[in-house]
């Protein structure tokens, strides 16, 4: 039985990607906003040597992340493309990967989690999408949302290769 949330978000992701498929920038914006809103976390993409993110305000929904130190560490991660690329390389599998708490190797981020997957994206195989937020995030929403982005992008990219 498919959860009604799953049907709703899957449809929204598919429609957003299909609608915006002719513009890389618009697809990125659409994906980031949908994933961030639905997961209540910060959504990010890393494509080659560029990273972008959306939804920093979602971090304020989690009391355990209200410390300036934690927020600053998260912002530093999001703004450090090399760090993100290394994390993806180290922990990536064929599906959706989870890095929870201190597994990241970053002291003081025991309350955080990162969920990410590889993303087919036009002319590169070096792209990932993910979310970072509280380790209390709703993984039942985060994992399917990222799987659907990956699947929808793979389907859209079939026509481009």
Predicted features and spans:
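Intrinsically disordered, acidic Ser/Thr/Pro-rich low-complexity regulatory segments
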Residues: 2-161
């Amino acid at each position: 039985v498919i959860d009604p949330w799953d049907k709703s978000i899957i449809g929204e992701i598919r429609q957003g990607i299909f609608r915006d498929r002719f513009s890389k920038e618009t697809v990125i914006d659409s994906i980031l906003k949908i994933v961030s809103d639905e997961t209540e976390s910060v959504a990010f993409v890393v494509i080659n040597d560029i990273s972008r993110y959306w939804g920093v305000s979602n971090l304020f929904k989690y009391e355990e992340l209200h410390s300036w130190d934690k927020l600053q560490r998260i912002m530093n991660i999001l703004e450090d493309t090399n760090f993100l690329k290394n994390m993806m390389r180290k922990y990536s599998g064929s599906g959706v990967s989870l890095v929870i708490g201190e597994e990241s190797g970053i002291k003081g981020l025991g309350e955080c989690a990162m969920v990410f997957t590889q993303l087919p994206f036009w002319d590169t195989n070096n792209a990932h999408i993910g979310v970072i937020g509280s380790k209390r995030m709703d993984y039942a929403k985060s994992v399917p949302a990222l799987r659907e982005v990956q699947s929808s992008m793979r389907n859209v990219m079939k026509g481009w290769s």
